[in-house]
């Protein structure tokens, strides 16, 4: 049986709304992939990945929220709600990195900067927090299930879990800031024509992402500092704080994915390599049409 006051019900409703938006994002990214055109295949792939991962994260968060308010939860660290929270935190960090990675991919595709060097940079920004994320998942489950650890070993595992839990959002915040910087630099310096709607959606998604990850990074640092003071420092937030936090952490992320999908449909559609039936030579993207073929030549370059 579920119990809770009005604020708990509002919190659960906010999580449910975020889950619904995440489901819409999955539908839009999978149901009609042709709306993006054939350009930017990596962007479309990462949009689908980020949308699916974020929906899984929201489904786990919704289940964990309901489960933590069930009467039969024993409140111990190993109860089902806490196990779901650890899994949700891990998948959530993976989905947030994927969203930032999709932002970078869309930026590179819109401004024709999808070079090998940029791909390596974006992949490095994606993998750096995920290495820490994997460490967090492993050591937290060691703490969760290894009951026979000596006290010193248990303390070491707890410290590693706390440190990685703090560092993962910080690394993702760094990646989100770099993504925003790339967007602003390419928009100011390149001459590639980009539809205003696509640039506006990309910029809005990047700004929301920076705000969201700044919020999370600050909160995690505060929690880490409080946990290191041996109880001398307590963080006391108003009752409605969790509802504000869920809007920033969940709704902003869902809107980021939705804005990226809309921006991709506006910016990537119609950017396929140009080819005309009266032209010959390779198809070229971003350049004027080739001269018409001579009248004695067919469109395949063969004489009559």
Set out the residue ranges of the language-model regions.
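Residue-level signal for alpha-helical transmembrane segments in multi-pass membrane proteins
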Residues: 21-28, 64-67, 102, 136-139, ...
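Cytosolic juxtamembrane helix at the C-terminal end of the final transmembrane segment
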Residues: 30-33, 103-117, 145-150, 181-194, ...
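The cytoplasmic-loop to transmembrane-helix boundary for the fourth helix
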Residues: 109-140
């Amino acid at each position: 049986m579920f119990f809770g006051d009005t604020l708990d019900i509002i919190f659960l409703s906010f999580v449910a709304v975020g889950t619904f938006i995440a489901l819409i994002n999955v539908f839009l990214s999978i149901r009609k992939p042709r709306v993006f055109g054939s350009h930017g295949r990596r962007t479309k792939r990462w949009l689908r990945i980020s949308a699916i991962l974020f929906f899984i994260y929201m489904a786990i968060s919704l289940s964990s929220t309901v489960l933590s308010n069930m009467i039969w939860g024993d409140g111990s660290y190993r109860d089902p709600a806490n196990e779901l929270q650890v899994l949700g935190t891990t998948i959530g960090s993976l989905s947030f990195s994927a969203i930032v990675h999709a932002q970078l991919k869309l930026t590179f595709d819109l401004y024709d900067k999808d070079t090998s060097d940029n791909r390596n940079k974006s992949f490095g920004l994606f993998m750096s927090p995920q290495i820490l994320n994997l460490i967090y998942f492993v050591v937290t489950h060691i703490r969760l299930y290894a009951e026979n650890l000596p006290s010193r070993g248990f303390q070491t595992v707890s410290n590693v879990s706390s440190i990685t839990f703090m560092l993962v959002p910080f690394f993702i915040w760094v990646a989100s800031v770099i993504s925003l910087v790339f967007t602003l630099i390419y928009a100011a310096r390149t001459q590639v024509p980009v539809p205003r709607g696509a640039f506006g959606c990309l910029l809005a998604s990047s700004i929301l992402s920076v705000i969201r990850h700044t919020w999370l990074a600050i909160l995690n640092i505060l929690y880490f500092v409080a946990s290191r003071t041996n109880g001398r420092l307590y963080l006391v937030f108003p009752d409605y704080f969790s509802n504000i936090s869920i809007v920033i952490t969940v709704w902003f992320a869902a809107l980021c994915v939705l804005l990226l999908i809309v921006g991709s449909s506006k910016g990537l559609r119609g950017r396929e390599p140009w080819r005309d039936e009266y032209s010959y030579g390779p198809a070229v993207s971003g350049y004027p049409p080739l001269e018409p073929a001579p009248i004695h030549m067919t469109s395949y370059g063969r004489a009559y």
